[in-house]
Amino acid sequence: MSRRNAAVKRPVLPDPQFNSRLASMMISRLMKHGKKSTAQRILSDAFSLISERTGGNAVELFETAVKNATPLVEVRARRVGGATYQVPMEVRQERGTAMALRWLVTFSRARNGKSMSQKLAGELMDAANETGSAVKKREDTHKMAEANKAFAHYRY
């Protein structure tokens, strides 16, 4: 274990185009091989597609989608006396948001569709309507935590 001080968390600056911290975080998650401008274009294209289809504010819909995909509890493996238990634990706000963004990107990539921006727009609209794979993943995570509630006293 490192004896040095813990690294200082840098604040996430809001994206200049959408003036949103979440959008900035999403761009970082979308980015592959350091191509940030490509990731920004994908997100802005997805937002314009969302605006066309819904006629509403795409950034607000995006924030709703992230909120709907954010888990409140998760299970973590804990070894006790030779047995490994799945212990349910609360998720901190930051980690929950990060997980939601990661799931949205992962399931967008897995979708069938033409371009990444279309797939991302579809996944975001589904998540905002409380359907879609990212929301299902959150529900599955909550079910796992509920099923393993008996091991909650092993929390650390």
Curated annotation (Swiss-Prot):
Intrachain S-S bonds: none
Top-level taxonomic group: Bacteria
GO molecular function annotation: rRNA binding; structural constituent of ribosome; tRNA binding
Keyword terms of this UniProt record: Ribonucleoprotein, Ribosomal protein, RNA-binding, rRNA-binding, tRNA-binding
InterPro entries found in the cross-reference section: Ribosomal_uS7, Ribosomal_uS7_bac/org-type, Ribosomal_uS7_CS, Ribosomal_uS7_dom, Ribosomal_uS7_dom_sf
Pfam families associated with the record: Ribosomal_S7
Gene Ontology cellular component annotations, sorted alphabetically: small ribosomal subunit
Biological process terms in GO annotation: translation
CDD domains reported for this sequence: uS7_Bacteria
Presence of the UniProt keyword S-adenosyl-L-methionine in the record: no
Cross-referenced NCBIfam families: rpsG_bact
Function: One of the primary rRNA binding proteins, it binds directly to 16S rRNA where it nucleates assembly of the head domain of the 30S subunit. Is located at the subunit interface close to the decoding center, probably blocks exit of the E-site tRNA.
Entry similarity comment: Belongs to the universal ribosomal protein uS7 family.
Subunit record text: Part of the 30S ribosomal subunit. Contacts proteins S9 and S11.
Record-given protein name: Small ribosomal subunit protein uS7
Gene: rpsG
